[in-house]
Protein backbone atom coordinates (compact mmCIF):
# COMPACT_ATOMS: atom_id res chain seq x y z
CA UNK A 1 0.00 0.00 0.00
CA UNK A 2 2.84 2.37 0.90
CA UNK A 3 4.62 1.50 -2.36
CA UNK A 4 1.48 2.30 -4.35
CA UNK A 5 1.11 5.63 -2.55
CA UNK A 6 4.74 6.47 -3.26
CA UNK A 7 4.34 5.69 -6.97
CA UNK A 8 1.20 7.80 -7.08
CA UNK A 9 3.09 10.70 -5.51
CA UNK A 10 5.88 10.40 -8.09
CA UNK A 11 3.35 10.30 -10.93
CA UNK A 12 1.61 13.42 -9.62
CA UNK A 13 4.96 15.21 -9.29
CA UNK A 14 6.00 14.34 -12.85
CA UNK A 15 2.59 15.41 -14.16
CA UNK A 16 2.86 18.70 -12.27
CA UNK A 17 6.33 19.39 -13.70
CA UNK A 18 5.11 18.58 -17.21
CA UNK A 19 2.13 20.90 -16.89
CA UNK A 20 4.34 23.69 -15.59
CA UNK A 21 6.80 23.19 -18.44
CA UNK A 22 4.03 23.29 -21.01
CA UNK A 23 2.30 26.27 -19.40
CA UNK A 24 5.46 28.40 -19.22
CA UNK A 25 5.18 31.54 -21.28
CA UNK A 26 8.35 33.31 -22.32
CA UNK A 27 8.83 37.06 -22.02
CA UNK A 28 10.80 39.06 -24.57
CA UNK A 29 13.62 39.49 -22.04
CA UNK A 30 13.78 35.73 -21.44
CA UNK A 31 13.82 35.00 -25.16
CA UNK A 32 16.62 37.46 -25.88
CA UNK A 33 18.71 36.30 -22.91
CA UNK A 34 18.28 32.63 -23.78
CA UNK A 35 19.12 33.23 -27.45
CA UNK A 36 22.30 35.12 -26.58
CA UNK A 37 23.40 32.31 -24.27
CA UNK A 38 22.64 29.46 -26.67
CA UNK A 39 22.80 30.76 -30.24
CA UNK A 40 25.37 28.91 -32.36
CA UNK A 41 26.52 32.03 -34.22
CA UNK A 42 27.32 33.74 -30.92
CA UNK A 43 29.29 30.70 -29.76
CA UNK A 44 31.32 30.88 -32.96
CA UNK A 45 31.97 34.58 -32.37
CA UNK A 46 33.15 33.78 -28.84
CA UNK A 47 35.66 31.35 -30.35
CA UNK A 48 36.94 34.18 -32.56
CA UNK A 49 37.60 36.20 -29.39
CA UNK A 50 39.60 33.30 -27.96
CA UNK A 51 41.62 33.09 -31.18
CA UNK A 52 42.44 36.80 -30.87
CA UNK A 53 43.79 36.21 -27.35
CA UNK A 54 45.95 33.37 -28.66
CA UNK A 55 47.31 35.65 -31.40
CA UNK A 56 48.28 38.17 -28.73
CA UNK A 57 50.25 35.50 -26.86
CA UNK A 58 52.10 34.78 -30.10
CA UNK A 59 52.86 38.50 -30.51
CA UNK A 60 54.21 38.71 -26.96
CA UNK A 61 56.33 35.62 -27.62
CA UNK A 62 58.19 37.47 -30.40
CA UNK A 63 59.86 39.62 -27.70
CA UNK A 64 61.16 36.57 -25.84
CA UNK A 65 64.38 34.70 -26.69
CA UNK A 66 64.20 31.41 -28.54
CA UNK A 67 65.87 28.46 -26.85
CA UNK A 68 66.60 25.18 -28.61
CA UNK A 69 68.42 22.18 -27.21
CA UNK A 70 69.85 19.27 -29.18
CA UNK A 71 71.48 15.93 -28.45
CA UNK A 72 72.76 13.11 -30.61
CA UNK A 73 74.48 9.76 -30.33
CA UNK A 74 76.34 8.29 -33.30
CA UNK A 75 78.05 5.07 -34.31
CA UNK A 76 80.95 5.32 -36.78
CA UNK A 77 81.47 1.91 -38.43
CA UNK A 78 84.36 1.31 -40.83
CA UNK A 79 87.88 2.70 -41.18
CA UNK A 80 88.80 4.68 -38.08
CA UNK A 81 92.24 5.79 -36.93
CA UNK A 82 93.88 3.72 -34.19
CA UNK A 83 95.16 6.11 -31.53
CA UNK A 84 98.12 3.80 -30.68
CA UNK A 85 99.44 3.19 -34.17
CA UNK A 86 97.94 6.06 -36.12
CA UNK A 87 96.81 3.58 -38.75
CA UNK A 88 93.30 3.16 -40.15
CA UNK A 89 91.51 0.06 -38.94
CA UNK A 90 88.00 -1.38 -39.33
CA UNK A 91 86.40 -0.66 -36.00
CA UNK A 92 83.27 0.93 -34.46
CA UNK A 93 83.44 4.13 -32.45
CA UNK A 94 80.64 5.92 -30.58
CA UNK A 95 80.14 9.58 -29.77
CA UNK A 96 77.52 11.57 -27.83
CA UNK A 97 77.09 15.29 -28.42
CA UNK A 98 74.74 17.86 -26.89
CA UNK A 99 74.19 21.55 -27.25
CA UNK A 100 71.87 24.51 -26.80
CA UNK A 101 71.23 27.65 -28.83
CA UNK A 102 69.64 30.92 -27.73
CA UNK A 103 68.57 33.68 -30.10
CA UNK A 104 66.81 36.98 -29.53
CA UNK A 105 65.67 39.85 -31.73
CA UNK A 106 67.33 43.08 -30.69
CA UNK A 107 65.86 45.15 -33.49
CA UNK A 108 63.50 44.14 -36.32
CA UNK A 109 62.22 47.38 -37.75
CA UNK A 110 59.62 47.76 -34.94
CA UNK A 111 57.70 44.86 -36.49
CA UNK A 112 57.36 43.06 -33.16
CA UNK A 113 56.01 46.16 -31.42
CA UNK A 114 53.51 46.84 -34.21
CA UNK A 115 52.45 43.19 -34.29
CA UNK A 116 51.65 43.37 -30.58
CA UNK A 117 49.66 46.58 -31.05
CA UNK A 118 47.77 44.93 -33.91
CA UNK A 119 47.01 41.90 -31.72
CA UNK A 120 45.56 44.16 -29.02
CA UNK A 121 43.37 45.88 -31.61
CA UNK A 122 42.25 42.50 -32.95
CA UNK A 123 41.06 41.57 -29.45
CA UNK A 124 39.03 44.78 -29.31
CA UNK A 125 37.61 44.13 -32.78
CA UNK A 126 36.63 40.58 -31.82
CA UNK A 127 34.82 41.90 -28.74
CA UNK A 128 32.94 44.42 -30.87
CA UNK A 129 32.03 41.67 -33.33
CA UNK A 130 30.62 39.62 -30.46
CA UNK A 131 28.58 42.59 -29.23
CA UNK A 132 27.32 43.21 -32.78
CA UNK A 133 26.32 39.56 -33.10
CA UNK A 134 24.37 39.75 -29.83
CA UNK A 135 22.63 42.94 -30.95
CA UNK A 136 21.62 41.38 -34.26
CA UNK A 137 20.31 38.27 -32.51
CA UNK A 138 18.35 40.43 -30.06
CA UNK A 139 16.71 42.36 -32.93
CA UNK A 140 15.87 39.17 -34.79
CA UNK A 141 14.38 37.65 -31.63
CA UNK A 142 12.33 40.80 -30.98
CA UNK A 143 10.97 40.73 -34.53
CA UNK A 144 10.11 37.02 -34.29
CA UNK A 145 8.58 37.56 -30.83
CA UNK A 146 6.29 40.31 -32.11
CA UNK A 147 5.33 38.14 -35.07
CA UNK A 148 4.18 35.44 -32.65
CA UNK A 149 2.14 38.02 -30.73
CA UNK A 150 0.55 39.27 -33.95
CA UNK A 151 -0.39 35.75 -35.04
CA UNK A 152 -1.80 34.95 -31.59
CA UNK A 153 -4.08 37.98 -31.63
CA UNK A 154 -5.00 37.41 -35.25
CA UNK A 155 -6.04 33.86 -34.34
CA UNK A 156 -8.23 35.26 -31.57
CA UNK A 157 -9.87 37.63 -34.05
CA UNK A 158 -10.54 34.81 -36.52
CA UNK A 159 -11.95 32.54 -33.81
CA UNK A 160 -14.17 35.31 -32.49
CA UNK A 161 -15.40 35.98 -36.01
CA UNK A 162 -16.12 32.27 -36.42
CA UNK A 163 -18.08 32.27 -33.16
CA UNK A 164 -20.13 35.26 -34.29
CA UNK A 165 -20.84 33.65 -37.66
CA UNK A 166 -21.94 30.42 -36.01
CA UNK A 167 -24.45 32.40 -33.97
CA UNK A 168 -25.45 34.28 -37.09
CA UNK A 169 -26.00 31.02 -38.95
CA UNK A 170 -28.27 29.76 -36.19
CA UNK A 171 -30.16 33.07 -36.24
CA UNK A 172 -30.48 32.87 -40.04
CA UNK A 173 -32.00 29.41 -39.79
CA UNK A 174 -34.68 30.82 -37.51
CA UNK A 175 -35.34 33.71 -39.91
CA UNK A 176 -35.65 31.28 -42.85
CA UNK A 177 -38.14 29.16 -40.91
CA UNK A 178 -40.09 32.32 -40.05
CA UNK A 179 -40.03 33.37 -43.70
CA UNK A 180 -38.21 36.63 -42.94
CA UNK A 181 -35.30 35.94 -45.33
CA UNK A 182 -34.98 33.67 -48.36
CA UNK A 183 -33.14 30.33 -48.10
CA UNK A 184 -30.46 31.65 -50.45
CA UNK A 185 -29.31 34.04 -47.72
CA UNK A 186 -28.81 31.07 -45.40
CA UNK A 187 -26.56 29.42 -47.99
CA UNK A 188 -24.53 32.63 -48.24
CA UNK A 189 -24.05 32.63 -44.47
CA UNK A 190 -23.05 28.96 -44.61
CA UNK A 191 -20.43 29.73 -47.27
CA UNK A 192 -19.12 32.58 -45.13
CA UNK A 193 -18.93 30.21 -42.16
CA UNK A 194 -16.81 27.78 -44.20
CA UNK A 195 -14.51 30.63 -45.18
CA UNK A 196 -14.18 31.60 -41.50
CA UNK A 197 -13.15 28.03 -40.69
CA UNK A 198 -10.49 28.24 -43.37
CA UNK A 199 -9.25 31.55 -41.96
CA UNK A 200 -8.93 30.00 -38.50
CA UNK A 201 -6.88 27.11 -39.90
CA UNK A 202 -4.65 29.55 -41.79
CA UNK A 203 -4.16 31.66 -38.65
CA UNK A 204 -3.28 28.56 -36.61
CA UNK A 205 -0.72 27.53 -39.21
CA UNK A 206 0.80 31.03 -39.26
CA UNK A 207 1.07 30.98 -35.47
CA UNK A 208 2.78 27.59 -35.53
CA UNK A 209 5.28 28.75 -38.16
CA UNK A 210 6.09 31.93 -36.21
CA UNK A 211 6.66 29.89 -33.05
CA UNK A 212 8.93 27.59 -35.03
CA UNK A 213 10.94 30.57 -36.29
CA UNK A 214 11.34 32.02 -32.80
CA UNK A 215 12.21 28.67 -31.19
CA UNK A 216 14.80 28.13 -33.95
CA UNK A 217 16.50 31.40 -32.97
CA UNK A 218 16.45 30.20 -29.37
CA UNK A 219 17.78 26.74 -30.36
CA UNK A 220 14.70 25.09 -28.80
CA UNK A 221 13.49 21.73 -30.06
CA UNK A 222 10.01 21.58 -28.47
CA UNK A 223 8.41 24.41 -30.42
CA UNK A 224 4.89 22.95 -30.31
CA UNK A 225 4.62 23.58 -26.54
CA UNK A 226 6.48 26.88 -26.81
CA UNK A 227 4.48 30.03 -26.06
CA UNK A 228 5.07 33.68 -25.19
CA UNK A 229 3.34 36.10 -22.86
CA UNK A 230 0.50 38.23 -24.24
CA UNK A 231 2.26 41.57 -23.79
CA UNK A 232 0.49 43.71 -26.36
CA UNK A 233 0.66 47.27 -25.00
CA UNK A 234 1.59 49.94 -27.53
CA UNK A 235 3.78 52.29 -25.51
CA UNK A 236 6.71 54.54 -26.23
CA UNK A 237 8.05 54.21 -22.69
CA UNK A 238 11.35 55.92 -23.48
CA UNK A 239 9.60 58.71 -25.43
CA UNK A 240 11.96 58.09 -28.34
CA UNK A 241 9.62 59.82 -30.80
CA UNK A 242 10.22 63.08 -28.92
CA UNK A 243 13.83 62.99 -30.12
CA UNK A 244 14.87 64.50 -33.43
CA UNK A 245 16.51 62.34 -36.12
CA UNK A 246 19.72 64.35 -35.81
CA UNK A 247 19.84 63.77 -32.03
CA UNK A 248 19.35 60.03 -32.54
CA UNK A 249 22.07 60.01 -35.20
CA UNK A 250 24.54 61.84 -32.94
CA UNK A 251 23.87 59.32 -30.18
CA UNK A 252 24.27 56.41 -32.60
CA UNK A 253 27.47 57.92 -34.04
CA UNK A 254 29.04 57.76 -30.59
CA UNK A 255 28.01 54.27 -29.61
CA UNK A 256 27.00 52.09 -32.57
CA UNK A 257 29.01 48.89 -32.63
CA UNK A 258 29.36 48.67 -36.42
CA UNK A 259 31.12 52.05 -36.40
CA UNK A 260 33.44 50.89 -33.63
CA UNK A 261 34.27 47.79 -35.66
CA UNK A 262 35.04 49.87 -38.77
CA UNK A 263 37.24 52.30 -36.82
CA UNK A 264 39.12 49.46 -35.13
CA UNK A 265 39.67 47.73 -38.47
CA UNK A 266 41.09 51.03 -39.76
CA UNK A 267 43.62 51.08 -36.91
CA UNK A 268 44.52 47.45 -37.65
CA UNK A 269 45.11 48.36 -41.31
CA UNK A 270 47.44 51.18 -40.21
CA UNK A 271 49.46 48.72 -38.13
CA UNK A 272 49.67 46.36 -41.10
CA UNK A 273 51.26 49.17 -43.12
CA UNK A 274 53.79 49.82 -40.34
CA UNK A 275 54.60 46.10 -40.13
CA UNK A 276 55.12 45.87 -43.88
CA UNK A 277 57.41 48.94 -43.89
CA UNK A 278 59.49 47.34 -41.14
CA UNK A 279 60.73 44.78 -43.67
CA UNK A 280 62.84 47.55 -45.31
CA UNK A 281 64.86 48.12 -42.14
CA UNK A 282 67.88 46.10 -40.96
CA UNK A 283 67.51 43.44 -38.30
CA UNK A 284 69.88 42.83 -35.42
CA UNK A 285 69.90 39.53 -33.57
CA UNK A 286 71.87 38.26 -30.62
CA UNK A 287 72.87 34.63 -30.27
CA UNK A 288 74.58 32.27 -27.85
CA UNK A 289 75.45 28.60 -28.32
CA UNK A 290 76.88 25.88 -26.11
CA UNK A 291 78.08 22.40 -27.14
CA UNK A 292 80.07 19.46 -25.85
CA UNK A 293 80.83 15.88 -26.83
CA UNK A 294 81.72 12.54 -25.25
CA UNK A 295 83.68 9.65 -26.90
CA UNK A 296 83.43 6.00 -25.89
CA UNK A 297 86.80 4.82 -27.38
CA UNK A 298 89.77 3.65 -25.30
CA UNK A 299 92.20 6.39 -24.25
CA UNK A 300 95.99 6.53 -23.60
CA UNK A 301 96.58 6.48 -19.84
CA UNK A 302 100.42 6.31 -19.89
CA UNK A 303 103.61 4.95 -21.56
CA UNK A 304 106.16 2.21 -20.75
CA UNK A 305 109.61 1.50 -22.29
CA UNK A 306 109.51 -0.76 -25.32
CA UNK A 307 111.44 -3.86 -24.26
CA UNK A 308 111.72 -5.33 -27.74
CA UNK A 309 112.89 -2.11 -29.34
CA UNK A 310 114.16 0.14 -26.57
CA UNK A 311 115.72 2.85 -28.79
CA UNK A 312 115.50 4.37 -32.21
CA UNK A 313 118.16 6.26 -34.20
CA UNK A 314 116.99 9.80 -34.68
CA UNK A 315 120.24 11.27 -36.13
CA UNK A 316 124.08 11.41 -36.16
CA UNK A 317 126.65 13.49 -34.28
CA UNK A 318 128.45 15.73 -36.74
CA UNK A 319 132.18 14.92 -36.93
CA UNK A 320 132.04 11.58 -35.10
CA UNK A 321 129.08 10.09 -36.92
CA UNK A 322 127.87 8.59 -33.69
CA UNK A 323 124.19 7.63 -33.59
CA UNK A 324 121.77 9.81 -31.68
CA UNK A 325 119.31 7.49 -29.97
CA UNK A 326 115.83 8.15 -28.62
CA UNK A 327 114.02 5.82 -26.23
CA UNK A 328 110.96 4.04 -27.56
CA UNK A 329 107.80 3.88 -25.47
CA UNK A 330 104.62 1.85 -25.78
CA UNK A 331 101.30 3.59 -25.07
CA UNK A 332 99.17 2.11 -22.33
CA UNK A 333 95.40 2.10 -23.13
CA UNK A 334 92.64 2.47 -20.53
CA UNK A 335 88.87 2.81 -20.35
CA UNK A 336 87.21 5.99 -21.63
CA UNK A 337 87.19 8.92 -19.23
CA UNK A 338 83.99 9.31 -17.12
CA UNK A 339 81.02 10.78 -19.02
CA UNK A 340 80.68 14.05 -17.10
CA UNK A 341 84.46 14.58 -17.00
CA UNK A 342 84.56 14.42 -20.80
CA UNK A 343 81.44 16.59 -21.09
CA UNK A 344 83.01 19.27 -18.90
CA UNK A 345 86.39 19.07 -20.62
CA UNK A 346 85.08 19.17 -24.20
CA UNK A 347 82.51 21.98 -23.76
CA UNK A 348 82.59 25.02 -25.99
CA UNK A 349 80.64 28.28 -26.19
CA UNK A 350 80.07 31.02 -28.70
CA UNK A 351 78.07 34.23 -28.68
CA UNK A 352 77.68 37.35 -30.71
CA UNK A 353 75.37 39.50 -32.81
CA UNK A 354 74.23 39.25 -36.40
CA UNK A 355 73.21 42.23 -38.52
CA UNK A 356 71.12 41.63 -41.63
CA UNK A 357 70.45 44.45 -44.09
CA UNK A 358 67.80 43.89 -46.79
CA UNK A 359 69.10 44.85 -50.21
CA UNK A 360 66.83 43.18 -52.75
CA UNK A 361 64.14 40.54 -52.23
CA UNK A 362 62.36 40.37 -55.56
CA UNK A 363 60.05 43.32 -54.73
CA UNK A 364 58.42 41.19 -52.02
CA UNK A 365 58.69 43.82 -49.27
CA UNK A 366 57.64 46.64 -51.59
CA UNK A 367 54.60 44.71 -52.83
CA UNK A 368 53.56 43.88 -49.26
CA UNK A 369 53.65 47.59 -48.41
CA UNK A 370 51.54 48.42 -51.45
CA UNK A 371 49.00 45.71 -50.54
CA UNK A 372 48.74 47.00 -46.99
CA UNK A 373 48.20 50.55 -48.27
CA UNK A 374 45.37 49.36 -50.51
CA UNK A 375 43.79 47.60 -47.53
CA UNK A 376 44.17 50.81 -45.53
CA UNK A 377 42.29 52.78 -48.19
CA UNK A 378 39.54 50.16 -48.16
CA UNK A 379 39.24 50.50 -44.39
CA UNK A 380 38.97 54.29 -44.68
CA UNK A 381 36.21 53.91 -47.26
CA UNK A 382 34.47 51.36 -45.03
CA UNK A 383 34.42 53.84 -42.13
CA UNK A 384 32.99 56.54 -44.37
CA UNK A 385 30.41 54.12 -45.77
CA UNK A 386 29.36 53.06 -42.27
CA UNK A 387 28.84 56.71 -41.34
CA UNK A 388 26.66 57.28 -44.39
CA UNK A 389 24.73 54.04 -43.86
CA UNK A 390 24.12 54.89 -40.21
CA UNK A 391 22.79 58.34 -41.04
CA UNK A 392 20.50 56.95 -43.75
CA UNK A 393 19.29 54.12 -41.51
CA UNK A 394 18.52 56.43 -38.58
CA UNK A 395 16.55 58.93 -40.66
CA UNK A 396 14.75 56.10 -42.46
CA UNK A 397 13.92 54.37 -39.17
CA UNK A 398 12.55 57.61 -37.73
CA UNK A 399 10.37 58.19 -40.79
CA UNK A 400 9.20 54.56 -40.69
CA UNK A 401 8.31 54.82 -37.00
CA UNK A 402 6.41 58.06 -37.55
CA UNK A 403 4.55 56.57 -40.49
CA UNK A 404 3.81 53.40 -38.51
CA UNK A 405 2.33 55.48 -35.68
CA UNK A 406 0.10 57.39 -38.08
CA UNK A 407 -0.97 54.14 -39.74
CA UNK A 408 -1.80 52.61 -36.35
CA UNK A 409 -3.85 55.60 -35.23
CA UNK A 410 -5.69 55.65 -38.56
CA UNK A 411 -6.42 51.92 -38.38
CA UNK A 412 -7.82 52.30 -34.85
CA UNK A 413 -10.14 55.08 -36.03
CA UNK A 414 -11.17 52.98 -39.04
CA UNK A 415 -11.90 50.01 -36.78
CA UNK A 416 -14.19 52.11 -34.58
CA UNK A 417 -16.11 53.21 -37.67
CA UNK A 418 -16.29 49.66 -39.05
CA UNK A 419 -17.47 48.34 -35.70
CA UNK A 420 -20.31 50.89 -35.64
CA UNK A 421 -21.27 50.04 -39.21
CA UNK A 422 -21.24 46.33 -38.40
CA UNK A 423 -23.42 46.80 -35.32
CA UNK A 424 -25.92 48.76 -37.42
CA UNK A 425 -25.85 46.08 -40.16
CA UNK A 426 -26.44 43.37 -37.55
CA UNK A 427 -29.56 45.15 -36.32
CA UNK A 428 -30.90 45.52 -39.86
CA UNK A 429 -30.09 41.92 -40.80
CA UNK A 430 -31.73 40.52 -37.68
CA UNK A 431 -35.07 42.08 -38.68
CA UNK A 432 -34.73 41.17 -42.35
CA UNK A 433 -33.95 44.69 -43.62
CA UNK A 434 -30.54 43.70 -45.10
CA UNK A 435 -29.65 40.82 -47.37
CA UNK A 436 -26.89 38.34 -46.55
CA UNK A 437 -24.51 39.66 -49.22
CA UNK A 438 -24.44 43.20 -47.78
CA UNK A 439 -24.22 41.84 -44.25
CA UNK A 440 -21.28 39.56 -45.12
CA UNK A 441 -19.59 42.49 -46.83
CA UNK A 442 -19.89 44.54 -43.62
CA UNK A 443 -18.56 41.62 -41.63
CA UNK A 444 -15.56 41.17 -43.96
CA UNK A 445 -14.72 44.87 -43.73
CA UNK A 446 -14.78 44.63 -39.92
CA UNK A 447 -12.45 41.61 -39.92
CA UNK A 448 -10.06 43.38 -42.29
CA UNK A 449 -10.08 46.45 -40.04
CA UNK A 450 -9.29 44.32 -36.98
CA UNK A 451 -6.40 42.62 -38.80
CA UNK A 452 -5.08 45.97 -39.98
CA UNK A 453 -5.04 47.28 -36.41
CA UNK A 454 -3.00 44.26 -35.34
CA UNK A 455 -0.59 44.60 -38.25
CA UNK A 456 0.03 48.32 -37.76
CA UNK A 457 0.31 47.92 -34.00
CA UNK A 458 3.13 45.39 -34.09
CA UNK A 459 4.78 47.16 -36.98
CA UNK A 460 4.86 50.33 -34.88
CA UNK A 461 6.20 48.47 -31.83
CA UNK A 462 9.07 47.01 -33.85
CA UNK A 463 9.86 50.36 -35.47
CA UNK A 464 10.08 51.90 -31.99
CA UNK A 465 12.44 49.11 -30.90
CA UNK A 466 14.71 49.87 -33.84
CA UNK A 467 14.83 53.59 -32.99
CA UNK A 468 15.63 52.78 -29.36
CA UNK A 469 18.32 50.42 -30.60
CA UNK A 470 20.01 53.24 -32.54
CA UNK A 471 19.65 55.57 -29.55
CA UNK A 472 21.55 53.09 -27.37
CA UNK A 473 18.58 51.81 -25.37
CA UNK A 474 18.95 48.03 -24.95
CA UNK A 475 16.10 45.73 -25.91
CA UNK A 476 16.22 44.15 -22.48
CA UNK A 477 17.00 45.71 -19.13
CA UNK A 478 19.91 44.16 -17.27
Question: Where would I find each of the regions flagged by the language model?
Answer:
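Small/polar, glycine/serine/threonine/aspartate-rich low-complexity segments that form flexible
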Residues: 23, 70-104, 232-240, 287-357
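Membrane-embedded beta-strand positions in outer-membrane beta-barrel channels/transporters
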Residues: 99-101, 145, 249, 352-354, ...
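Terminal intrinsically disordered/low-complexity segments used for targeting and assembly
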Residues: 1-34, 204-250, 300-304, 310-336, ...
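Periplasmic alpha-helical coiled-coil/stalk elements that build and connect Gram-negative outer-membrane
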Residues: 54, 136-255, 400, 404, ...
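Short segments within alpha-helical structural elements
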Residues: 47, 195-220, 409-473
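Bacterial Sec-pathway N-terminal export signals of envelope proteins
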Residues: 21-68, 72, 78, 222, ...
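Sec/SRP-type N-terminal targeting helices
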Residues: 43-47, 60, 92, 106-134, ...
Amino acid sequence: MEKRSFLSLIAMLVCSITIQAQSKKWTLEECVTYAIQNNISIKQSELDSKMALIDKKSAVGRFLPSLNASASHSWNIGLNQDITTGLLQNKTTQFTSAGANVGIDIYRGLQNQNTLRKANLSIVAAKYQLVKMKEDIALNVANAFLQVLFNKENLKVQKEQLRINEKQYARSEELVKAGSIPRGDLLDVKATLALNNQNVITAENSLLISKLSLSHLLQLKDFENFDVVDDTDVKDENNIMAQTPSAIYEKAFEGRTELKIARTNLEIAEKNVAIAKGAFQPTLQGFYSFNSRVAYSDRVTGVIPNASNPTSIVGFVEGTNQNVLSPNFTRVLGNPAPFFDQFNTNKGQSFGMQLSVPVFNGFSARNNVERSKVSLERSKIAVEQQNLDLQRNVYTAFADAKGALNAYESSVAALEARQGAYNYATEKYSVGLMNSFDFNQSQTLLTNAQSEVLRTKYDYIFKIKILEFYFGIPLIKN
